[in-house]
A protein has these predicted regions:
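Noncatalytic, beta-rich nucleic-acid-contacting surfaces in large DNA/RNA-processing enzymes
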Residues: 1-268
Length: 268
């Protein structure tokens, strides 16, 4: 499955379907991690699929390759500051740092994602000061190596403080993650409702397109989170809507017409 994802890593919708299939089969799919992910999708020692760095939306292959190459050459990144000190800035820019922070690529360092966007008393985000710190560290390191003393002294530059930041809501954090990796990986917005959904629902959202199976049921009960709404008009010019619902097993689309669409469109 990891190999199939790799072949389609440029097709986010296809990857999303494959990851949903993995989840339904009980195969754990983990988000990106700078200390375990490779450029493409892979399988870790526990048999879990690890998201490939270059499959993150907005993360280029050169940045992914540079991160992995440095890790393989000099060992795992010990902290976010160690990462900033070692990464190749000719390939890994600020946008790559931001993408990794939002997608969970830095989660293993124990820093909450929102803290990367917290500001100091100068109005600078931790993300900006972190990148600047790393670039300055490497500049000083280069100058020391080319000095008369041969760079024998350790580089001493103060690391930027990690700010406190107001916690994002679970849905905000997960939505930002989903925008970049195509699926909820670290958690699911419906986790706290899992017992209710499993007890009451007899249909998964992914089954909405199977009209024959739905017709066999006396009642159709399902639950999920709305992830998309499209407004359209019928051939006769009447308004209608198509709502994308997602649960733990996948997603499906529900069509609403007439009074139903008029009743619900204002709150979706």
């Amino acid at each position: 499955m990891a190999a199939l994802m790799t072949r389609r890593f440029a097709q986010i919708p296809e990857i999303t379907k494959l990851m949903e299939e993995c989840q339904s089969m009980g195969i754990k799919t983990l988000g990106p991690d700078v200390n375990e992910s490779y450029r493409v999708f892979g399988v870790n020692e526990h048999g879990e699929i690890r998201f490939g760095l270059s499959a993150i939306k907005g993360m280029g292959a050169p940045a992914a390759d540079a991160i992995v190459a440095e890790r393989l050459k000099n060992g795992p990144y010990k902290s976010i500051f160690d990462f900033a000190e070692r990464v190749d800035y000719s390939s890994v820019n600020r946008k790559a740092f931001e993408t990794l922070a939002l997608s969970g690529g830095f989660d293993s360092f124990g820093i909450r994602r929102e803290q990367f966007f917290g500001k100091n008393n100068k109005g600078e985000t931790f993300l900006d000061t972190l990148v600047r710190y790393g670039q300055l560290f490497q500049q000083e390191q280069h100058e020391a190596a080319n000095s008369l003393f041969g760079g024998t002294e350790a580089i001493e530059i103060a690391t930027p403080p990690i700010p406190d930041a107001e916690s994002w809501s679970t849905i905000e954090r997960l939505n930002r993650e989903r925008e970049l990796v195509g699926i909820y990986l670290s958690a699911h917005p419906l986790d706290e409702y899992s017992i209710i959904l499993n007890s009451l629902c007899n249909t998964h959202c992914s089954e909405l397109g199977d009209k024959q199976e739905l017709a066999k049921k006396e009642d159709v009960v399902l639950g999920g989170i709305i992830t998309g709404v499209r407004s359209k008009f019928t051939k006769t010019g009447k308004p209608c809507g198509f709502v994308t619902l997602e649960d733990f097993e996948g997603s499906g689309e529900l069509a609403l017409f007439g009074e139903d669409w008029g009743k619900w469109r204002g709150i979706m």
